[in-house]
Amino acid sequence: MAGPGLSEIPEARTDAEVMLRVKTGDESAFTYLVQKYRRQMVGFMYRMCHNPAAAEELAQEVFLRVYRSRESYEPSAKFNTWLYRIATNLAVNHARDTRHERPENLLRLDEPDQETGATPDLPDGSMTAEEQMLRRERMNEIRKRVRGLPERQKMAVIMHKYQQMDYREIAEVMKLSESATKSLLFRAYETLREQLQELVSRK
């Protein structure tokens, strides 16, 4: 039997209210949250581990942990923040456990985005072959440099740049003050800027 569509949960309900239904054992409410956040979680995990199969598995594990931890959820906590805390902890553990296994060639520009199915890095037909090659090189370098950041900086950049989360949301997920979050992102972006400028100057 298919789970509930998004329209079956009244829009007036917040995610926190839906999660309270999950807390009481309402499986249809849990299915609703999975449907709503699955693409987002797969996209986040893909950007953290750069492996499509691992991203799917990690996203599934996030939701398993959400269900197993449902009794500990407090409605005072924003569901999105609680969800990303679970996801970031899982991503950090996965990165630690697989740091010697990650091949360099996992980043591919022609792979569809794990969240949207789009290929945003691919240039349009108006670009010359040389421009396309330069764009591919630049995007590969940016992704490579993001991947090389310290884990907390990388996580903050991914949430800020790709998940479109603001400073307050990132701060809540990472249990930092907003000023500390801004400093963390500033250092990360400054490192990326310096590395990319150095790369350009060598060419």
Language model features: what each stretch is:
Residues 140-180:
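Helix-turn-helix DNA-binding module
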Residues 36-39, 47-50, 139, 158-165:
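Short helix-capping/turn signature of helix-turn-helix
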Residues 71-75, 85-107, 135, 198:
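Arg/Lys-rich amphipathic alpha helix in sigma70-family domain 2
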